[in-house]
Amino acid sequence: MQEAYSILNYFIMESNASDRLPTPYRQIRASYDEDTITVYQAYSSTIAIPAVKQQKLNASPDFRLSRMTWVKPSWSWMMYRSGYSYKDARQAHILAIKMKHEHFKHLLSLAVLTHGISMVTPTLERKGKNANVRVQWDPERTPASGMLPYRSIQIGIPAALTEQWVEKWVVGIEDVTERAKALKATLDENSDLTIGELIERRLIPEERVYELSEDLRMVLHMNDKS
């Protein structure tokens, strides 16, 4: 893994703007260690509770291997997408899912680019059994769900790979819903807290730039500006 830079470099407003590094338009920022990377997805209680207990996403029959599953490495984007777990019952539990780096990068190597959630229709999901991994770049969000001028990656795992992902590539599952709710409550009380302060309070994870080979960057169109 090449040298990574804290997401603090991109979110915290410093006094001298000229000293800040500009954030590339397309960049993966994630929580990871030497062996694994964390991605997020929100599920209903009937799926999430058994998944955490048994450390298997398909522990419940409600988890459908026949559907495309979307995951994202950005905590703030997951908060936006799920409404901090309050959006609806199908997203009431936010799970932090750990994958080994080689499996995560293998998913990315199979990717084709889409251009937004609106393109992921039920027909496309049904075709997912024979589809490639789908990647889209959506506007990154602040912890308070404000839109940022650069993009965050979302990864659609097709049905053809879902069973392998669930059975072999997921190495850890944690329910982080209470952290999401605590973040929302804290921001409702004080919206001026910095990223650093939220990290210190353990309300958001520290995310770093996730470096990729030039070949993977080309697959993901990471040098595109729109």
Summary of predicted features, one role per range:
Residues P61-R141:
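ADP-ribosyltransferase catalytic core
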Residues Q41-Y43, K100, D138-E140, G156-A160:
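Structured loops at beta-to-helix junctions and adjacent beta-edge loops in soluble globular domains
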Residues S31, D35-T38, N130-R134, Y150-S152, ...:
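Non-catalytic, substrate/partner-engaging modules appended to enzymatic cores
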Residues L21-P22, R26-A42, Q55, R81, ...:
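Partner-binding and oligomerization surfaces adjacent to conserved cores of proteins
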